[in-house]
Amino acid sequence: MTTKRKPYVRPMTSTWWKKLPFYRFYMLREGTAVPAVWFSIELIFGLFALKHGAESWMGFVGFLQNPVVVILNLITLAAALLHTKTWFELTPKAANIIVKDEKMGPEPIIKGLWVVTAVVTVVILYVALFW
């Protein structure tokens, strides 16, 4: 026997995520993938320019000096930092580190990750600029 009753379908607007700050921040965090795609394409373009010689590389450097590209790269940097911050805050929730029979709080783990990030950044900059 089948029923003729229609199931209730709750209406969902396309702006459902704008109602709560948690959802807005979630959408912002997920949106950091778009600048990551831009940077990936730019990096691949740069590698091909490097492969094709000095003239092609100089064209790529000129492309990077375009003010629009500089602004896009600054937006990409901000998005990468936001993404990094959120992942560093999630890491302690996924790792149970026990020291002297007590669970370690999230602060030392988050600070440690930022220290590692800063050290690696300084090493890469030193190698790139002075090696």
Curated annotation (Swiss-Prot):
Q: Does the keyword Transcription apply?
A: no
Under InterPro entries, the record lists: Fumarate_red_C, SQR/QFR_C/D
A Pfam family of the record is Fumarate_red_C
Residue ranges of the TM segments: 30-50, 57-77, 109-129
- Taxonomy, superkingdom: Bacteria
GO cellular component: a single term? plasma membrane
Q: What does this protein do?
A: Two distinct, membrane-bound, FAD-containing enzymes are responsible for the catalysis of fumarate and succinate interconversion; fumarate reductase is used in anaerobic growth, and succinate dehydrogenase is used in aerobic growth. Anchors the catalytic components of the fumarate reductase complex to the cell inner membrane, binds quinones.
Q: Which HAMAP family match?
A: Fumarate_red_C
Which family is this sequence assigned to?
Belongs to the FrdC family.
Report the protein name in the record. Answer: Fumarate reductase subunit C
Q: Which organism is it from?
A: Salmonella heidelberg (strain SL476)
